[in-house]
Amino acid sequence: MHDATAGTAASHHDDAGRAATDAEPVRRAAVVIHPGKHDDLDGFRAAVGKAMSDLGWAEPLWLETRPDDTGERLAQEAVRSGVDLVLASGGDGTITACVSGVAGSGVPLGVLPCGTGNLLARNLGLPLSLDEALAVALTGSDRRLDVGAANGRPFVVMAGIGFDAEMLGGADERLKSRVGWAAYVLSALRHLRERPVRMALRADGGPPQRRWASGVIVGNVGSLQGNVRLLPDAVPDDGILDVAVLAASGWTGWLWLAADVLLRRKTGRVAHLTCRELTVQAGRARPWEVDGEVAGTTRQLRVTLEPGCLLVRVPAGNDG
């Protein structure tokens, strides 16, 4: 009787040991957060913590951006710590900085959008509400995306030189918080009289194509603020950059160009091309931007592409 009891106890101990060994390890995420983008930071932290706890995730690693680190080094730190997922919560600039930190690591990026543009989220069909975005980030599928680089700075949405950078740089921050993407429209109106600049475009090392241009936009995805589909054929995982060359001046010229884009008309005001590498040489220094962040002025914009180097968490079944 004693032997049978001992044997039973030993058997139960072995079963418990196997269960512990076979149990799935507790997952942990890092949250890179731009505190200035949140009106209720404590409420945000509580909502994220509860969502993770409800799904059996460990308490997240919290990392706040600073003026000297908008997210890239923080995301790298998170990857080195061994997390299973990096969540980025902020505007497009924060998302792009985190992309730079996790690209090529094999650790997926989850997006918790809270900025004005939210262009990556909108182009990938990601939800904008926190609860839904958390559900996708914690239970969705991973999609492998291309990452571009403009003058060495990574982007996943778009980079550009000329008019779009002027528009982005001129948008008032307080107005953006009140009226959203319409602030960019108001900024654009102030630059309609700018005359096109002579530019030379060299795609994939080919001969230069010289033309007058107000701006050149290079995209990994197709939609701008307001869901304007500037690059209708752009796909973020096809290994190809889509390019739009814009040429207009004055109210009338830009109205015609806007109509061309909305109606997808092929005219000299909007020219499209595709490539894997592009160099733009401008006749004079022009502002340039990456993923909605103005980077300064330059006469040359060199854009390259690294196919499939980024994993992004998307709704289940939407992984390409």
Where are these regions (language model features)?
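ATP/NTP phosphate-donor binding region
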Residues: 1-86, 319-320
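ATP/nucleoside-binding phosphotransfer catalytic cores, i.e., glycine-rich phosphate-binding loops
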Residues: 2-7, 12-17, 203-205, 210, ...
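Catalytic core of DAGKc-family lipid kinases
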Residues: 32, 42, 54-55, 65, ...
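Glycine-rich beta-strand-to-loop/alpha-helix junction loops that act as flexible
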Residues: 35, 89-91, 114
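Glycine-rich phosphate/pyrophosphate-binding beta-alpha loops
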Residues: 160, 164, 217-230, 294
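Gly/Ser/Thr-rich active-site loops/lids in small-molecule metabolic enzymes
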Residues: 175-183, 218, 226, 232-253
